[in-house]
Design a protein with these regions (language model features):
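Non-catalytic, mostly N-terminal accessory regions of nucleic-acid modification and defense proteins
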Residues: 1-229, 288-301, 394-397, 415, ...
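Conserved Class I SAM-dependent methyltransferase catalytic core
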Residues: 24, 33-46, 273, 291, ...
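Short, contiguous acidic/charged loop-to-helix segments that flank catalytic cores in large enzymes
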Residues: 28, 321-341, 366-375, 396-402, ...
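C-terminal, active-site-flanking charged/polar segments
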Residues: 59, 388-389, 399-462
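Hydrophobic alpha-helical scaffolding
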Residues: 153, 182, 237, 265-269, ...
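Conserved S-adenosyl-L-methionine
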Residues: 207-312, 317-321, 325-328, 333, ...
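Hydrophobic alpha-helix feature that most strongly marks membrane-spanning transmembrane helices
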Residues: 252, 281, 285, 315, ...
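Active-site lining segments that contact anionic ligands and/or coordinate catalytic metals
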Residues: 306-307, 329, 341-343, 357-365, ...
Length: 550
């Protein structure tokens, strides 16, 4: 019997293998630290594989009649001695959006050292040198972008070698999906990288929310803002860059050229800034993340930028943002935000970045819709009176792993009802959507918005603003879900922007499939017991971590 052909790993298999690789490090590092070791190696594995894939294409192009011969000025086959030089021509790779990886920095060198077939230096030193070399040969990567801590001793050589050999089992070559369409290596690796970021964020809990926004929330922001080809997109609190990935997917899905979208981001945390660089590089997204990691309030890396689309999920209700140092900043056009809460500082910073007709979507704590402390009520009133607020969405609970604080979405539009193509005919009106009852539980502790629900929310907004699309129809208020409210009514309610105040109560209806009360109580009791179990597990993890540092 002929030997059975080795089955190529599928994306789901890759994700499972990657997560096992993280487990190999868990014994010595916590989630916040080990993600950088693992994701850095994933990046190194990917850039080497992507270059090999491109190298194979170049070799094909150098054969008789190949596409590359004429481009290089050859009438026939190139001299044999010239072929190796051509295949190492850096511009042939970087010009195609592929990182050039010098021979000494390639994955096979790292793998051979991990297997013990190469002598000193240490494996950690080999990896650090590879990262440094890749930065040096690719000008799109600023110095210090890639992690270079593998020789620090925080991970022993045996564990590191096991991780390298485990990652070597992955294949990042292009595949054919179930629908028969070719899925590129970059798309596959992008999926794996995003999945891994999500898993690390889950492990880190609250801290993970600093660099990761739930995909369904990102999707909703992008679907409602509708970025287009040729526009400039900014995220002043970009985390690992997930907003940009989804924005470019939206442009491409709607027939635009995703390469013709200018992307700008800023992130203050060095390690998260590195994660964003690697994440966006794997997705093939050219981005300007500034010269260095920096705080958007005090060291704006894009001072003169005017953007068409601004979106962000900044940290909720932060009090240590240094507001007392800014005073009467030019950005505070609607009022000076309170020193003890940055919510309205984030909004005004984003609005200050608007190009004519600019639009923004921002995730904030629910308190931003009704708080009057520190002058927030006056700032909110000024924004509404200036017809800046287009739509408010109250989100369901448990969407965010990192916080139990209820959240909402603000959608702002410059010139709404005047020259804005985004919301051209709704001057003096605000759309309120109450989505608190939507979503399904993906686990005992996490809720997600379904495709249908995302379509319902975004479609309602699109119909309200007069957009076009299949099945949109005319906008109508739906009791308990959405309502368009005039400026006069908002004045009567002192500019409170909580959707539940305006949309009313859904019409009572007898649902034959409704869950009986006894069954509901039983189910909720089981869910509560599950939460108790999860709490016990997390307490054990915390005690273990405290034991290591004590």
């Amino acid at each position: 019997m002929p030997p059975r052909k080795k089955k190529e790993a599928q994306p789901e298999d890759m994700k499972s293998i990657l997560w096992k690789s993280a487990d190999k490090l868990r014994g010595s590092l916590d989630a916040a630290e080990y993600k950088h070791f693992v994701l850095g190696l994933v990046f190194l594995k990917y850039v080497s594989a992507a270059m090999e894939e491109k190298r194979a294409q170049l070799e094909e192009g150098l054969r008789p009649g190949g596409w590359l011969l004429a481009d290089l000025g050859f009438d026939g086959e190139p001299p044999a001695a010239a072929v190796p030089q051509i295949l190492e021509d850096r511009e042939l790779y970087t010009g195609a959006g592929i990182f050039y990886v010098p021979p000494t920095a390639r994955w096979e060198v790292v793998l051979e050292r991990a297997k013990g077939t190469l002598d000193d230096p240490t494996l950690g030193k080999v990896i650090d040198t590879a990262m440094e070399t890749i930065e040096k040969f690719n000008t799109s990567l600023k110095k210090g972008t890639l992690p270079q801590q593998y020789n620090s001793g925080r991970v022993d050589e045996t564990t590191l070698a096991g991780l390298v050999k485990l990652l070597d089992r992955l294949t990042f070559q292009a595949q054919v999906g179930e629908d028969g369409q070719r899925v590129g290596a970059r798309d596959l690796m992008g999926e794996v990288y995003e999945y891994f970021l999500a898993q690390f964020a889950l492990q880190e809990g609250r801290k993970g929310g600093e660099y990761f926004t739930p995909p369904s929330v990102v999707r909703l922001l992008v679907e409602m803002l509708e970025p287009e080809e040729g526009e400039r997109v900014l995220d002043p609190a970009c985390g690992s860059g997930g907003m940009f990935v989804q924005a470019e997917k939206f442009v491409e899905t709607h027939g635009g050229d995703r390469m013709n979208v200018a992307v700008y981001g800023q992130e203050r945390n060095l390690t998260t800034w590195r994660l964003a660089h690697m994440n966006l590089a794997i997705h093939g997204i050219e981005v300007d993340l500034g010269e260095e990691p920096a705080d958007s309030f005090h060291n704006d890396q894009h001072g003169g930028l005017k953007a068409d689309v601004v979106l962000a999920n900044p940290p909720f209700n932060i009090s240590d943002w240094g507001g007392e140092q800014l005073g009467l900043d030019d950005r505070w056009a609607y009022g000076t935000p309170p020193v003890g809460n940055a919510n309205f500082a984030w909004m005004q910073h984003m609005v200050s970045k608007f190009a004519p007709g600019g639009r923004a979507g921002i995730v904030l704590a629910n308190g931003s819709m009704s708080s009057k402390s520190g002058g927030e009520g006056d700032i909110r009133r000024a924004m509404v009176e200036d017809d800046l607020v287009a739509c408010m969405v109250a989100l369901p609970g448990q969407l965010f792993r990192s916080t139990q604080i209820p959240a909402c979405l603000w959608f702002l539009g410059e010139g709404k009802g005047r020259h804005s193509k985004w919301v051209p005919g709704r001057k003096g009106e605000v759309l309120f959507i109450d989505a608190r009852e939507l979503g399904v539980m993906a686990s005992r502790t996490e809720r997600v918005l379904t495709e249908e629900e995302l379509g319902r929310i975004a479609g309602t907004f699109r119909a309200w603003r007069g957009g076009e699309g299949e099945g949109l129809g005319l906008y109508e208020d739906v009791p308990g879900f959405c309502r368009s409210v005039s400026l006069d009514e908002l004045r009567k309610h002192e500019f409170m922007l909580t959707p539940g105040r305006y949309v009313g109560v859904a019409e009572a209806a007898v649902d034959p499939d409704a869950e009986p009360v006894e069954e509901r109580v039983t189910r909720l009791a089981k869910e509560l017991l599950g939460l108790f179990e999860e709490s016990g597990r997390l307490e054990g993890v915390l005690r273990e971590q405290l034991g290591r540092v004590s």
